[in-house]
């Protein structure tokens, strides 16, 4: 099955990036969009990470009755493409009323759900993109995947990012 032409154009419009975005760049991007599109956006702090970083959520309005979509980047802090993807989607939705109308949602976008983990990966985000450099600056939390399962036999506390997303989905 072929992709719709409008979606192929959206994909083709994604630009190149010389490096991945860190916590500060993702936060700046959300703040810039909120300032540039105040008639359709709201930027709120929806929580705080374990180390005191703000968890920011950009809401992009839809039409009354539209369902709400939650998008969040970096559920795994060593996968920074998610932050750039969330930020790109937010920018496209803000800039293009036709795209908002086509997708018919109210959007809640958190560009970085794990700023503490991303900060620990910032050493490799700008390169050089070699295995050695990546390995020397790599961080990923140890343990099982518990983001959406909440408590498990390995943990007694649901991760902060999971609690924030669960609250936003309601």
Where are these regions (language model features)?
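Short glycine- and acidic-rich boundary segments immediately preceding or forming the N-terminal edge
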Residues: 1-56
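Hydrophobic side chains in beta-strands
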Residues: 59-60, 71, 111
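Short beta-strand element of the alpha/beta-hydrolase
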Residues: 67-76
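Short beta-strand-to-loop junctions in surface cap/lid or active-site-entrance loops
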Residues: 57-65
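Active-site-proximal beta-strand/loop segments in catalytic clefts of secreted hydrolases
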Residues: 46, 74, 111-114
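Active-site/substrate-binding loop(s) of hydrolase catalytic cores
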Residues: 66-67, 80-84, 88-170
